[in-house]
From Swiss-Prot:
PROSITE patterns found in the cross-reference section: 4FE4S (PS51656), 4FE4S_FER_1 (PS00198), 4FE4S_FER_2 (PS51379)
Biological role stated in the UniProt entry: Part of a membrane-bound complex that couples electron transfer with translocation of ions across the membrane.
Family from the record: Belongs to the 4Fe4S bacterial-type ferredoxin family. RnfB subfamily.
Top-level lineage group: Bacteria
Species of origin: Aliivibrio fischeri (strain ATCC 700601 / ES114) (Vibrio fischeri)
GO molecular function terms attached to this record: 4 iron, 4 sulfur cluster binding; electron transfer activity; metal ion binding
Pfam families reported in the protein's UniProt record: Fer4_21, FeS
Subcellular location: Cell inner membrane
Listed name of the protein: Ion-translocating oxidoreductase complex subunit B
4Fe-4S domain sequence ranges: 32-90
């Protein structure tokens, strides 16, 4: 047999053995997790911003499952709070966040002050900042969650958090206040026409 064929057979045998070992280990050492934690974690926005006081969304999901408040996630907003309340079977808190945090904000980079250090890009958990080394950076407003993690690392203080401009697309339309009236139609039935 040629040396290439022997090498291929040896590598295939090693791959098979290691695959079996990993498969056995994954079954043997499987960690059972609480399904409610997984459901809560799926609802959270996964920005890992830390505004809730926990190092990420998974630890916050575990805290909610253990009875912590459901309204500590500013990037998730009111929609996330309502989904969490529905899942946990609790009432939606009347004031989700304090007044200052309830106004959605996004990062804004003053490009005339930006030196292109990329520290804000590295800090952004959702990759909402674009730019390169020694080039100007800008924020993709639709992607920014307002987590405020990019402000502190900036050496020139060229990043500020500004309120989101209200447009017809992001306006909170309250459709429940529109009166709905059922109009009865008094059309004669076919049997009365005969």
């Amino acid at each position: 047999m040629s040396s290439i064929l022997i090498a291929v057979i040896a590598i295939a045998a090693l791959a098979l053995v290691f695959g079996l070992i990993l498969g056995f280990a994954s079954i043997k050492f499987k960690v059972e997790s609480d399904p409610i934690v997984e459901q809560i974690d799926a609802i959270l926005p996964q920005t890992q911003c830390g505004q809730c006081g926990y190092p990420g969304c998974k630890p916050y999901a575990e805290a909610i499952a253990n009875g912590d408040m459901i309204n500590k996630c500013p990037p998730g907003g009111q929609a996330t709070i309502e989904k969490l309340a529905d899942l946990m079977g609790v009432d939606v808190p009347s004031s989700a966040h304090d007044e200052e945090k309830s106004i959605k904000k996004v990062a804004f980079i003053h490009e005339d002050m930006c030196i292109g250090c990329t520290k804000c890009i590295q800090a952004c958990p959702v990759d909402a900042i674009v730019g390169g080394t020694k080039a100007l950076h800008t924020v993709i407003e639709s992607e920014c969650t307002g987590c405020d993690l990019c402000v502190a690392p900036c050496p020139t203080d060229c990043i500020e958090m500004i309120p989101v401009k209200t447009t017809p697309d992001n306006w909170k339309w309250d459709l429940n206040t529109i009166p709905v009236v059922n109009i009865s139609t008094d059309q004669p039935s076919k049997s009365s026409e005969l």
